[in-house]
């Protein structure tokens, strides 16, 4: 079945928490990609006082630091260079690879779009547009 994946590094803001609560009320499993260290270091901004990880069925920790920045620049009082972008992209790509492998093992053609920048890419992708739009 379907699931909802919500990505929020801090996990504290009202909208992602509300999205998770609505999904749960509809019996849709919620998968969260967040920084547990960051979430646990700040108060929630949702009226329930809950963080995103509190309402998730599955929590994937991106292992980010509070504030999501890891480098200091000479002459700057703030840290720079967030890790959540790179970590999140890598985690999502690993999940995609695992899902595709499992679908193929079950004999199911995964609905994967190929790059429109390769010859035949647009034509290949047409097969999925009608299928995915109906969902």
Question: How should these model regions be labeled?
Answer:
Residues 101-135:
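Active-site phosphate/pyrophosphate-binding segments
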Residues 1-97, 104:
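Glycine-rich phosphate-binding loops that contact phosphosugars or nucleotide phosphates
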């Amino acid at each position: 079945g379907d699931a909802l994946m919500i990505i929020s590094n801090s996990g504290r803001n009202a909208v992602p928490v509300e999205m998770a609560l609505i999904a749960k009320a509809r019996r849709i499993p919620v998968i969260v990609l967040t920084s547990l260290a960051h979430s646990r270091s700040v108060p929630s901004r949702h009226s329930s006082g809950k963080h995103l990880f509190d309402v998730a069925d599955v929590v994937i920790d991106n292992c980010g630091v509070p504030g999501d920045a890891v480098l200091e620049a000479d002459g700057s009082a703030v840290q720079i260079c967030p890790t959540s972008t790179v970590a999140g992209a890598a985690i999502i790509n690993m999940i995609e690879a695992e899902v595709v492998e499992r679908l193929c093992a079950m004999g199911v053609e995964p609905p994967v779009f190929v790059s429109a920048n390769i010859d035949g890419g647009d034509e290949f992708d047409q097969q999925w547009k009608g299928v995915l739009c109906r969902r």
